[in-house]
């Protein structure tokens, strides 16, 4: 059950994504990393059709690195989000990509969090969710988020979101991989749903 969640703070950005790949009623893989890390300061996570997501993440990351080398374009979350948007728009009329993406990281001046949906609608947001998480967790994110949030508080919010998804979704979510972008680089954590007793 594809789900990803993102939260941005003043000096960090966090993205969490489930690690399970399923096809119809079958579980294909239980420990898949749905992230693409670019230059230790930007993270992309995509939900939807995993073939589309993998190919799009690879295409966008390689194209962005090429543009940086060839044309001197500085990579930022904004640049990558707009590249994803262009790729989605190109495919809309031929064969629509079934992906939603979250791009988080450190831009030239501040930390950014971008959301791109499967139709190419793009927005810069303080928090977002995609996939099945979008149906459930916005209430928690809206209630708990503040502009001066800390990393620990953001992880606590994400834990509440993961617990809610475990409670509401039919398919068993084993855990979420979390990427935290800070000035010191990218940290990786795992969030496991806490079962109520």
Swiss-Prot record:
UniProt xrefs under Pfam families: Proteasome
Subcellular location per the Swiss-Prot or TrEMBL entry: Cytoplasm; Nucleus
Cellular component GO terms, alphabetical: cytoplasm; nucleus; proteasome core complex, beta-subunit complex
Gene Ontology BP, a term: proteasomal protein catabolic process
UniProt superkingdom: Eukaryota
Keywords: Cytoplasm, Nucleus, Proteasome
First-listed, main subcellular location of the protein, grouped into a coarse class: cytoplasm
InterPro entries: Ntn_hydrolases_N, Proteasome_beta2, Proteasome_bsu_CS, Proteasome_sua/b, Proteasome_suB-type
UniProt xrefs under Gene3D superfamilies: Glutamine Phosphoribosylpyrophosphate, subunit 1, domain 1
Entry annotated with the keyword Nucleus: yes
Subunit structure: The 26S proteasome consists of a 20S proteasome core and two 19S regulatory subunits. The 20S proteasome core is composed of 28 subunits that are arranged in four stacked rings, resulting in a barrel-shaped structure. The two end rings are each formed by seven alpha subunits, and the two central rings are each formed by seven beta subunits. The catalytic chamber with the active sites is on the inside of the barrel.
Function, in words: Non-catalytic component of the proteasome which degrades poly-ubiquitinated proteins in the cytoplasm and in the nucleus. It is essential for the regulated turnover of proteins and for the removal of misfolded proteins. The proteasome is a multicatalytic proteinase complex that is characterized by its ability to cleave peptides with Arg, Phe, Tyr, Leu, and Glu adjacent to the leaving group at neutral or slightly basic pH. It has an ATP-dependent proteolytic activity.
Family: Belongs to the peptidase T1B family.
Protein name per the record: Probable proteasome subunit beta type-4
Source organism (scientific name): Encephalitozoon cuniculi (strain GB-M1)
Gene: PRE1
